[in-house]
Each structure stands twice: as structure tokens, then as C-alpha cells.
Amino acid sequence: MSFRKEDGVSSLCQKALHIITELCFAGQVEWDKCSGIFPADRSGQGGGGTDISVSLLAVVVSFCGLALLVVSLFVFWKLCWPCWKSKLVAPNLSVLPQSISSAPTEVFETEEKKEVEENEKPAPKAIEPAIKISHTSPDIPAEVQTALKEHLIKHARVQRQTTEPTSSSRHNSFRRHLPRQMNVSSVDFSVGTEPILQRGETRTSIGRIKPELYKQKSVDSEGNRKDDVKTCGKLNFALQYDYENELLVVKIIKALDLPAKDFTGTSDPYVKIYLLPDRKKKFQTRVHRKTLNPLFDELFQFPVVYDQLSNRKLHFSIYDFDRFSRHDMIGEVILDNLFEVSDLSREATVWKDIHCATTESIDLGEIMFSLCYLPTAGRMTLTVIKCRNLKAMDITGSSDPYVKVSLMCEGRRLKKRKTTTKKNTLNPVYNEAIIFDIPPENVDQVSLCIAVMDYDRVGHNEVIGVCRTGLDAEGLGRDHWNEMLAYHRKPITHWHPLLELPGRATSFDSQGSCSSPRPPSTP
């Protein structure tokens, strides 16, 4: 009986413990009171699991909050920053026009004050900055040019040349360089006075040069030269204008009866085509091997407005390809009038004679310079302005050009000057003045040789091309000189084509004199 009672009591105790545990886990009883009833291992497991779950939940919530904050900041920056930026820049932009508008007015006021001060000075002092140009060919300042120009405009009617040399020492240096055949001792280098010419008066003298006579002679000589041009075959091409796309369509068809340039009795011809005066855009046909009658049949398009066609010229240059040396120029065709055949609304076929290549026709570029002579001061100023379309002398397709000017007398070089070097360009701009002291009695006996050189740091400087001006020059060189002598104290500016130097040397500095760059006479 006692055994059964103990079993019943134990079962009741277990049921009671079970009920108490359910109440504790259900939250009906405080956990501190329940911890003393449960076994140590079970109570420890229940408390540790709860702590781990709470800490894990806190980490997840904090991470999500941080991610949400980053996303919100990024969206805010994308949407709101451009608006704020424009608002910040707007006030600064409103201030800029005021500063810009105020700056030119201050500059103009200072320039006007300087001009007024210069105009109030005597005439010799006003011309002094322009006359004192360095003989080492510096750049002419823009302020000196403007001051001199305005002074000459105001005083041109009543002001005569007032620059008088103090002594004849300047002419003595020139006298030492003259050849012995000239009787220099009998030459009077004194400077005479000239009467002031009033408005409407004209000065006539027996020795005055008349440029009309020289111009007429040069025109006649050029006309005779054109009649004597030697031909070397014919070129066939077609022209048409595309009104819709504003394109000049040029079709090079073929060439006939070309001269043989190779020792085998044939040539390897190809054609280069330009639409002058712009030489930056050019086209070239394929090379046809070993033939004197090549059939090209190639089409090229030049973008040009129809109204500008009357001022354009087509230039065809026919070359012989040489793999191992410089390509030989066979000849050229220049079409001065594009409307010679038709109005180009339809395709028009043209046959033209190919003019044989001469030294003058080789394209080496052009140079622009001005000449001005002051007879009372015995001073000649040559201003090198710029060059264009120079021949590329470096492997990079460019050049480092500078201009060298030599004062010549009967084949001897008396003096030489040069400009600065312009790096890596085929169209350099100089605006540099070069001055020579030449007495009026010796102007007819001298000439100027202008050479455009390519500077080479390692080897010799090479000659790109030369031109010459003087009474013994030909064509434009002589006309430019005569015009300078006819209009004293006035800069005369012209473009001059560069010619290849006969007996071309690698270095122009090694030559004792500048040989004449005249093209060879055609039969």
C-alpha cells in the first residue's frame, strides 16, 4: 500500500511540474520565480536562445536602416543637386557681364589718352618709334603700327619726310661692300631737301620711273611665254555640278601621249587635283604602271557653293611615280573658267593640253612681303608677313620654316638678315621687318633674294623655295620693285610664288651668293 501511494504522489508531482512549466513558458508566471523550479540545463538553454534571437533581430534592423539611409541620400543628391547648382551659378554669371563690359572701356580710355599724347608731340618724335626698328628682325608691335598709321593719315597732306641722317656713316658701310667697278668715290651721298608739295600739285622729273611702261612690258612677255609653252600630251575629264548636295563632280577619264620618264620608255602616271585657291583639300588617282595612255575613270567631289564657282580654278598635276626617289612632275592642266564648256547642269566632257612641267610650275608654296623705300633716309624696309602652302620637308609632313633675305649686288651678297623660326607649320605668320641702308644712287644696282628655309636641328638647313625682286628680276619680282620706287614711303605688298633654286644645294648658308631663281626659258 505504501508503494502505491508513493507512485501516485510522484505522478502528481510530475503533472504539477508540467503544468507549472507550461504556465511559465506561456508567460503567466514571472521568469525569475520559474528559474528555481526548472533544472539548470533547461533554464540555461531557454534564456540563451532568447538573447541570441534578440541580438540577431537588432543587427538586421540596424543594417536595413543604414541601407535605407544611403538610398535616400543618393536619390536626394540626384534630384536636388542640379537645381541648387544652377541657383548658385546664376549670381556669378550676372556679375561677369559687368566686369567684361567695364574692362574694354578702361582699355579704350587708356588707348585714347596715349593717342592724344602722341598726336600732341612733334612730328619727328611721332615717327621715331616706327623708324627705330631693330636690324635683328624683331616683331613689329601693334601699338607702333597703329600710331604710325594714324599719324601718316593726319599729316599726309602737308608733312614731308623729316628723317634726316646726321652723317654719311650709314652709307659708308654700304660703300665698302660695293664692287670696285663702281666709281663710289664720285657718288654724292649727301641728303638733299625736297620742296613741300601742296594739295593738287604734281611733281614731274625726267628721271622718274613710270610703272605703266614696265607693267605693259611684263604683260607682253607673259603673253609671249604662254604662246611658247610646250605640251606633253592631253588630259580628258568631265565636269558636272550637283545642285542638291552642292558638289562639283570631277571625273578624270584618261590621258594620251604622255612622255616617257623611265629608262624602259614608259611611265607610271597618276593625277593630283586641286580646286584653287584652296589647296588643303586635294584628291589623287591610282597609279597606272608602265603606260603612256592611262585610263583612270575615277570620280571626285568638291564641296563648293555654286555662286563661288566663278572664282575657282581646277588644277590637275600629272606625276610619274618613282618608288625609290622623288616623283617626277610630267605636266599640269589649269582650267581657269569652270563654265568654259557649259553651265555644268549636265556632264560636260573636256579635252585639255598638258603643259610640260617647269621650275615655275612646281608647287613649293607662296610668300607675302611688303617693300617700302625712304629715299631721303636711304632706308629700305622689307616686312615678311606670312607664307602659305609650303612644301613639307620633314617626315612628319610639316616643316620648321624661317625666311632669309640677302641684299645682292652684281652676284655678290652684301648683307643678310633672317626671321625667327616657326615650328611645325606649313602656313607660318611672321610680321617681322628687315631693314637695309641703301643710298638712292645705288637702288638700281641692287636686288633682294628671299629664301624660305627649313630649320633642321641635326643636319643642314634645307631650302624650300626662293624668290627674287629687283630691276634685274623677272615678272612679278621686277613689277614689285618698280612699284616700290614709284610710290615712295608707302608699303607695297604682294604674294610671290616660291621657285626651286637652280643647282639646288642642301644648305643655303654654304653658298656665297644667291643664284637667280629664274625659270628656264622654254623653247
UniProtKB/Swiss-Prot annotation:
Binds 3 Ca(2+) ions per subunit. The ions are bound to the C2 domains. The modification Phosphothreonine is found at residue 136. Pfam families: C2. It is found in: Cytoplasmic vesicle, Secretory vesicle membrane. Its cofactor is Ca(2+). GO terms for biological process: chemical synaptic transmission; positive regulation of calcium ion-dependent exocytosis; presynaptic dense core vesicle exocytosis; regulation of calcium ion-dependent exocytosis; sensory perception of smell. Highly expressed in the olfactory bulb. Disruption phenotype: Impaired food-finding behaviors due to defects in sensory perception of smell. Decreased number of olfactory bulb synapses in the external plexiform layer, but not the glomerular layer, of the olfactory bulb. The size and dendritic arborization of olfactory bulb neurons are decreased, but not the synapse density per dendritic length. Defects are due to impaired exocytosis of IGF1 in neurons of the olfactory bulb. Its main location: membrane. It is a single-pass membrane protein. Ca(2+) 4 binds at residues 394, 400, 454, 456. Residues 13-35 are annotated as: Cysteine motif. The chain crosses the membrane at residues 56-76. Residues 77-523 are cytoplasmic. GO terms for molecular function: calcium ion binding; identical protein binding; phosphatidylinositol-4,5-bisphosphate binding; phosphatidylserine binding; protein heterodimerization activity; protein homodimerization activity; SNARE binding. It comes from the Eukaryota. One of its GO terms (cellular component) is presynapse. Keywords: Calcium, Cytoplasmic vesicle, Disulfide bond, Exocytosis, Membrane, Metal-binding, Phosphoprotein, Repeat, Transmembrane, Transmembrane helix. CDD domains: C2A_Synaptotagmin-1-5-6-9-10, C2B_Synaptotagmin-3-5-6-9-10. Ca(2+) sensor specifically required for the Ca(2+)-dependent exocytosis of secretory vesicles containing IGF1 in neurons of the olfactory bulb. Exocytosis of IGF1 is required for sensory perception of smell. Not involved in Ca(2+)-dependent synaptic vesicle exocytosis. Acts through Ca(2+) and phospholipid binding to the C2 domain: Ca(2+) induces binding of the C2-domains to phospholipid membranes and to assembled SNARE-complexes; both actions contribute to triggering exocytosis. Belongs to the synaptotagmin family. This is Synaptotagmin-10.
